[in-house]
């Protein structure tokens, strides 16, 4: 089984915690997780992947972080067709509209969003959110 990448941006550590839980799920299912902060990642590593995960908290008016994550996602959109992508993020306010938009964006690029929607957590992820992240990792490992 090849590496399954989990690439994220985290400002407070909440999304990083979720990335760790996704990796735990991948490993529990027998896969190998390669967890990277988006600032040290290249979208090129995902081109040959069948499945991977992306995580980013809601920023500003419910959008992706603009400095590193948005440009990364724009690159991924160019080759997302046929891939299974797990999405996860945390938020402070709102109702997760950014996640619905992000999932729709990936689907419009031809990807399948694992589980049909992303995993979200309000601020610090609770055990339910972390368990959902682990399940997401297991789903990605099965692709």
For the regions a language model picked out, list residue spans one by one.
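Short polar catalytic/cofactor-binding loops
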Residues: 9-13
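FMN-binding flavodoxin-like domain, especially the glycine-rich phosphate-binding loop
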Residues: 3-4, 14-17, 23-38, 45-143
């Amino acid at each position: 089984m090849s590496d399954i990448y989990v690439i994220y941006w985290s400002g407070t550590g909440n999304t990083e915690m979720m990335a760790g839980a996704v990796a735990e799920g991948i490993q529990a299912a027998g896969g190998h997780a390669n967890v990277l902060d988006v600032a040290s990642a290249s979208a090129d590593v995902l081109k040959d992947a069948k499945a991977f995960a992306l995580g980013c908290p809601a920023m500003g008016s419910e959008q992706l972080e603009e400095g590193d994550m948005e440009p990364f996602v724009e690159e991924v959109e160019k080759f997302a067709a046929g891939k299974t992508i797990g999405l996860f993020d945390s938020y402070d306010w709102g109702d997760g509209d950014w996640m619905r938009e992000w999932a729709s964006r990936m689907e419009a690029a031809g990807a399948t969003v694992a589980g049909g929607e992303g995993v979200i957590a309000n601020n610090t992820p609770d055990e339910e959110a972390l368990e959902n992240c682990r399940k997401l990792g297991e789903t990605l490992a099965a692709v």
